[in-house]
Regions:
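Short capping segments at the starts of secondary-structure elements
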Residues: 33-43
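Radical SAM/AdoMet-radical enzyme domain recognition
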Residues: 136, 140-156, 165-290
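Iron-sulfur (Fe-S) cluster-binding segments and ferredoxin-like electron-carrier domains
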Residues: 117-131, 373-379, 414-451
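Short Fe-S-cluster ligation motifs
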Residues: 140-158, 396, 434-478
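Acidic, low-complexity/disordered tracts enriched in E/D and polar residues
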Residues: 1-35
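Conserved alpha-helical substructure of the radical SAM core
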Residues: 58-204, 209
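C-terminal accessory region of radical SAM enzymes
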Residues: 306-340, 370-417
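Local cysteine-cluster metal-coordination motifs and their immediate loop/turn environment
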Residues: 109-119, 368-371, 405-422, 474-486
Length: 486
């Protein structure tokens, strides 16, 4: 499968199954397109000779050489490569039940009242509650017991607002550290917070114990304060920004992300990203499209898509400009490592929700991920009895890119792994469906990310200043020398 497109002055050809990315001239671009349409090299060459007959810089010999190059790349498996991965997908139901990550809902309550919140202002359409230390401790024991030989274990403190249960977070990390050596585990904690509860103690603790922190900010003050308000309806921007700045400064080079949501009301979301970068000093950025009912005022529309596509292109080109100036920023969805993975297992199966990754409620119930919490049809079990709804777990095991018929002809499927099961469920009623609007956005982001990779390879100045990413994928391994354990 081939995907071709033109962006920012580059002719880009992606060979889907080999993962090869080619930047080519006009002749090669047209030649590959004709072959992909089923023409023989001879017939394609004849068409190109007619098309380029008026150009002195394109001779019949040049066209012949071009087809020789195409044949050479094809023989090397870098063009028109066959799909060698389908067979991997059919064995997924028989894979192990190893769990590698938990999302701990330490608080089903929140000190903000964001109107677009999928979690119903932190209560997940149920009762408010805080996780006890005993429940959290059992969740960590459950993770260790079901992690097999995997060493690296991921735990995200989530809510609601997890800092409303900060004491339990501290106790749980202390407990995890106390059992790491005995079980040969390495816990990596993430704190996701709206910032209201950040104190100097929280900053010191996060910077000591958290592998990553995710800080919720939608960008410009007027954008952020449209939705991210407290229970009295007051905006949160002025209270959280200084705290975020202090935390990030204290983290030094440790991981963090500013995580925003854009809606129909701010499809010019690059202004929010640039505000966070230029005015506030944040360099690690993420901005997610809202997922809302179609009749919601903030829901994105089909009419918004051209504007969003323009925004993604604007962002990619501006990031290249910043790189050349030696002041790069990171955008989460443009992180792409073409050399080091993730492995094909991860590229087929995605996030592992419901199998390798689960969410734990304050009462110890297990769900496939945070977006399923509160739906009784998607309760997997609990941290004491384990996964008791094995049929549901098996259904999620089969939730991969090859299980989605709509993904069959999509060039981006080995980059999205079939997309989000929760979004598919909400859009189609089936976790094996596809959220088509999200697919369109994802494909555009991938085109921009690939274009940036091409630009960095072709421009030494960009390459010198580019932010380097190497995948730390542990999708099927134990973190030791690339050992694979499915």
């Amino acid at each position: 499968m081939i995907h071709q497109y033109k962006l920012s002055g580059y002719n880009i050809v992606l060979d889907v199954y080999s993962g090869s990315v080619h930047a080519v001239d006009d002749v090669a671009y047209d030649a590959i397109a004709l072959i992909d349409q089923g023409l023989s090299c001879q017939d394609a060459a004849a068409q190109l000779e007619k098309k380029y007959a008026g150009r002195a810089d394109v001779t019949p010999a040049d066209i012949s050489d071009c087809f020789d190059d195409i044949e050479e790349l094809t023989a090397a498996g870098q063009l028109f490569a066959p799909d060698a991965y389908a067979d991997h997908a059919f064995d997924f139901k028989n894979r192990s039940n190893v769990v590698k990550a938990l999302c701990l809902h330490v608080a089903h309550t929140c000190n903000l009242n964001c109107s677009y919140c999928f979690a119903a202002q932190g209560k997940f359409h149920g009762e408010a509650g805080l996780m006890s230390f005993e429940t959290g401790k059992r969740a960590l024991d459950f993770l260790v017991e079901h992690s097999g030989t995997r060493r690296n274990l991921e735990v995200d403190f989530f809510g609601g607002e997890p800092l409303m249960n900060f004491e339990v977070c501290k106790q749980l990390v202390a407990y995890a550290r106390s059992i790491e050596k005995e079980h040969n585990k390495n816990f990596r904690f993430t704190m996701t917070t709206n910032g209201i509860g950040i104190t100097d103690e929280v900053i010191d603790w996060c910077n000591k114990e958290c592998h990553n922190v995710v800080l919720s900010l939608d960008g410009r003050k007027e954008v952020n304060d449209r939705f991210r308000v407290d229970l009295a309806g007051n905006g949160s921007y002025d209270r959280i920004v200084p705290k975020f700045q202090k935390l990030v400064k204290a983290r030094g080079g440790q991981g963090y992300y500013m995580r925003g949501t854009f809606t129909h009301h701010n499809v010019d979301f690059t202004k929010d990203l640039f505000h966070m970068a230029d005015d506030l000093g944040f360099t690690e950025l993420s901005m997610e499209p809202v997922v809302a009912p179609p009749d919601s005022p903030e829901a994105l529309t089909e009419e918004d898509l051209p504007k969003l596509f323009d925004q993604y292109e604007l962002l990619a080109n501006d990031m290249l400009r910043r790189q050349k100036a030696g002041k790069p920023i990171t955008f989460y969805h443009y992180i792409l490592d073409l050399k080091h993975g993730p492995c094909i297992y991860k590229r087929i199966s995605g996030c592992g929700s419901g199998t390798e990754y689960m969410a734990v409620t304050p009462w110890g119930d297990l769900y496939p991920c945070h977006q399923f919490v509160g739906d009784p049809n998607y309760k997997l079990g609990n941290v004491w009895d384990g996964v008791t709804n094995t049929a549901l777990r098996d259904e999620f095991k089969l939730c991969n890119v090859y299980a989605r018929p709509d993904c069959k002809d999509c060039w981006a499927r080995l980059y999205c792994a079939g997309g989000c099961a929760a979004n598919a469920l909400h859009a189609t009623g089936d976790i094996h469906g596809t959220y088509e609007y999200g697919c369109k956005v994802f494909r555009k982001r991938m085109e921009c990310a690939l274009m940036m990779q091409v630009a960095q390879r072709l421009d030494p100045e960009l390459a010198k200043n580019a932010v380097k990413f190497e995948s730390d994928c542990d999708g099927c391994g134990d973190g030791n020398d690339g050992a694979c354990e499915k």
